[in-house]
């Protein structure tokens, strides 16, 4: 599927002003004057008065939960893929944080692979720290 987004206020990450984009599958195929294509296979979306930004990168995400500094009651739950997508995040770097007792590298790696399978790009930093 090819999607043509027209009249969007585009940031990439610098402001490009109002412009058009072509998206082929999950990739930006063309931007600006090169984003001119029509036909039966092209879906057009009018983004007038809307902002168009690339997927954001969260470089420190507690994808298997965070917290724990205040004991077991202060732990937080795992990240859901919808939480990332609704925030515009398409790439994550998962970390353990302070809790390497109840959260493990195996869990972190498994969650990163699961998020990859759900459509996000996910990496891991290994190790943790104690407070």
Q: What is each residue range found by the language model?
A:
Residues 1-3, 10-53:
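Histidine-rich, glycine-flanked metal-binding segment
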Residues 5, 43-45, 57, 93, ...:
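Hydrophobic/aromatic beta-strand patches that form the interior of the parallel beta-sheet core
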Residues 47-110:
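Metal-associated gating/positioning segment near the N- to mid-region
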